[in-house]
Curated annotation (Swiss-Prot):
Its cofactor is Zn(2+). It comes from the Bacteria. The gene is thrS. The lineage of its organism: Bacteria, Pseudomonadati, Bacteroidota, Bacteroidia, Bacteroidales. It catalyses: tRNA(Thr) + L-threonine + ATP = L-threonyl-tRNA(Thr) + AMP + diphosphate + H(+). Belongs to the class-II aminoacyl-tRNA synthetase family. It is found in: Cytoplasm. This is Threonine--tRNA ligase. One of its GO terms (cellular component) is cytoplasm. Keywords: Aminoacyl-tRNA synthetase, ATP-binding, Cytoplasm, Ligase, Metal-binding, Nucleotide-binding, Protein biosynthesis, RNA-binding, tRNA-binding, Zinc. Homodimer. Binds 1 zinc ion per subunit. PROSITE patterns: AA_TRNA_LIGASE_II (PS50862), TGS (PS51880).
Length: 651
């Protein structure tokens, strides 16, 4: 008999070789219908795989991320099987599950797969679902795998196999389709009741622009059709909120192929928005004694060799800048941290000087393949709201608490009320790859866990997910339509202090290494603005929006009165513009609603005679007529209320 421990710490005994499906059936028939895969000692398994030793088991359902992953991984195989039947001779690359659905990279040869073919592919997938094909795992030798896929002319698969270590290789088979795969997978195809092919795109094999461009098909599946319908409705809403579309409508930013792909340019309104965000963060950081610094946009190659960034980014970075006189090489800055390490090193440091908190809105450049570029969320030049804290090991917990406060203030002020966190710690067993002493790691890991507990923050702990140089805490927010975005990171670093030989003199008069903490509440200004646009659909908080008021005269003869109002509001620090185009008032209202301006003031003969304005509020319509001073007090009162909420959350 073997002992199975469940997440609630209850224990049951089963015969050796019992499968996770049999365990589910022993608990309830409903659970057996809902379970998709199982976590066995932290590793996700197929439900049919025998468990031969005592184990900790969690039965995974749709609600679990690992359950969805297995579901969508099996869906990728289902789509591949359908493609194999529809396009004889098609060759397969890779087909992983992703955050929302799955994709498969395929080489259809002379055939062309286009959007008009999606319905036929979906129909074939549902035909295979109805067959309830069993998904079978098989362990074979590397030689057998090479022969199997080689005989089929699967050149992409044989390339992958050739790079694997000698030993057992896993394949999965359903119907006539067999794939090289680690798994896990569902028991059979009948689980995949609702299918949808979403899009088709090009993708270079293994992300290498010098290799062949394959066809990438994206899809998504659900256990129920109702869930698919809800998702497709969500997709339509997401299209309306696309930051690229709204950013263009609101004149926030632009791109130009003449300037260069992936290089955003901020227009006046977008710049005003961005600067206001930066000032907001500066005000918060000032309370926590951050000192702002400014560093050059390039650095000597030797700096990045020392930091290790040259090894990571050098090969794929932009071309170096050569100085003919000195014969030196300079690179566009990929990270701010090496420069901050040199600032720390500029002066002798005592334990009394720590923590030292250096902040910078630093622009960095990293090469991204053109196919990976996407609006503001994936660019080649971006500005990080970066800060690096140099502290003693005993100060790590308090610094985490402080940064968590800052991130919480940012999220609440921007109305990201729904967020979660993940703690990434060392692997429980394999610890050779981590730099730094066990003692310091244990202190840092304990400090992060305790900080989350003190703040009442429910954080998921992931062992083995820490970087080799330190544990970290990541924050994920849910936007207004339920999508998850990773925003805000706090990362402990034992690597750079070692590489740069950073020191401080301790109370014992001996030299010690400081702990370095990286943090960025926004992540990058570009990505944060993109997420904020899609979260708010461009309807920013009143204090933040670039233009708070648009004054619209109903005819040219009231233009002077409109500009007089704009000046009066400007004197009270209200951001107002005048739309004095020779257009009908209905057209002006529609155009400015598209620009998401919170308030519109309509002025005509009646308003001019009474020194009033007719007020319309975005999303609420007509608010009636009022004196200019009354309106100004109303607007400033709204802003003050928002700022008071921020102030309370900061106290």
């Amino acid at each position: 008999m073997i002992k199975i421990t469940f997440p609630d710490n209850s224990v049951r005994e089963y015969a050796k070789g019992t499968t996770a499906m049999q365990i589910a059936e022993s608990i309830s028939s409903r659970l057996a219908q809902e379970v998709l895969a199982a976590s066995v000692n932290g590793e996700v398994w197929d439900l049919s795989r025998p468990i031969n030793d005592d184990a900790t088991v969690k039965l995974l359902k749709w609600e679990d991320e690992e359950g969805k992953h297995a579901f969508w991984h099996s869906s990728a195989h289902l789509m591949a099987e359908a493609l194999q039947e529809l396009y004889p001779g098609i060759k397969f690359g890779i087909g992983p599950a992703i955050e929302n659905g799955f994709y498969y990279d395929v080489d259809p040869g002379e055939a062309v797969i286009k959007e008009g073919d999606f319905a036929a592919i979906e129909a074939k997938m549902l035909e295979l679902v109805a067959k309830k094909e069993e998904i079978k795992r098989q362990d074979i030798t590397k030689a057998d795998a090479m022969k199997m896929f080689g005989d089929r002319g699967e050149e992409y698969k044989t390339e992958l196999i050739s790079e694997l270590e000698d030993g057992t290789i896993t394949t999965y088979t359903q119907g006539s389709f067999t794939d090289l795969c680690r798994g896990p997978h569902l028991p059979n195809t009948s689980y995949l009741k609702a299918v949808k092919i979403l899009s088709v795109a090009g993708a270079y094999w293994r992300g290498d622009e010098k290799r062949k461009q394959l066809v990438r098909l994206y899809g998504i599946t659900f256990p129920k059709k109702k869930m698919l319908d809800e998702y497709l409705t969500l997709l339509e809403e997401a299209k309306k909120r696309d930051h690229r579309k709204i950013g263009k409508e609101m004149d926030l930013f632009m791109f130009s192929d003449t300037v260069g792909k992936g290089l955003p340019m901020w227009l006046p309104k977008g710049t005003a928005l961005r600067l206001r965000l930066q000032e907001f963060l500066r005000r918060i950081q000032a309370r926590y004694n951050y000192q702002e610094v400014m560093c050059p946009p390039i650095g000597n190659k030797l700096l990045y060799i020392t930091s290790g960034h040259y090894a990571k980014y050098g090969k794929d970075s932009f071309q170096p800048i050569h100085t003919p006189e000195e014969g030196e090489e300079y690179f566009l800055k990929p990270m701010n941290c090496p420069h901050h390490c040199m600032i720390y090193k500029n002066s002798p440091r005592s334990y009394k000087d720590l923590p030292l908190r250096l902040a910078e809105f630093g622009t960095v450049c990293r090469y991204e393949q053109s196919g990976e570029l996407h609006g503001l969320t994936r660019v080649r030049s971006f500005t990080q709201d970066d800060a690096h804290i140099f502290c003693r090991p005993d100060q790590v917990k308090q610094e985490f608490l402080n940064v968590m406060d800052i991130i919480s203030i940012v999220f609440k002020t921007m109305n990201f009320e729904n967020f979660e966190a993940q703690i990434s710690l060392r692997d429980k067993v394999n610890r050779e790859k981590y730099i730094g002493s066990d003692e310091n790691w244990e202190k840092a890991e304990q400090a992060i866990v305790e900080a989350c507990e003190e703040k009442g923050l429910k954080a998921k702990i992931e062992y083995g997910e820490a970087a080799f140089y330190g544990p970290k805490l990541d924050f994920m927010v849910k936007d207004a339509i339920g999508r998850r975005w990773q925003l805000g990171t706090i990362q402990v670093d034992y690597n750079l202090p070692e590489r740069f030989q950073l020191e401080y003199t301790g109370a014992d008069n001996q030299k010690h290494r400081p702990v370095m903490i990286h943090r960025a509440p926004f992540g990058s200004m570009e990505r944060f603005v993109a997420v904020l646009i899609e979260h708010t659909a461009g309807k920013f908080p009143l204090w933040l929006t670039p233009e708070q008021v648009c004054i619209m005269p109903i005819s040219e003869k009231f233009n002077d009165y409109a500009w007089q109002i704009a000046r009066e509001l400007g004197n009270q620090e209200i951001r107002a513009i005048v739309d004095d185009r020779n257009e009908k008032i209905g057209r002006k209202i529609r155009d400015n609603e598209l620009k998401r301006i919170p308030y519109m003031l309509i002025v005509g003969e009646k308003e001019a005679e009474n020194s009033e304005v007719s007020v319309r509020k975005q999303g609420e319509g007509d608010k009636g007529s009022m004196k200019i001073a009354t309106f100004a007090a109303l607007l400033n009162g709204e802003v003050e209320e928002m700022m008071n909420r921020w102030q309370k959350s900061n106290d």
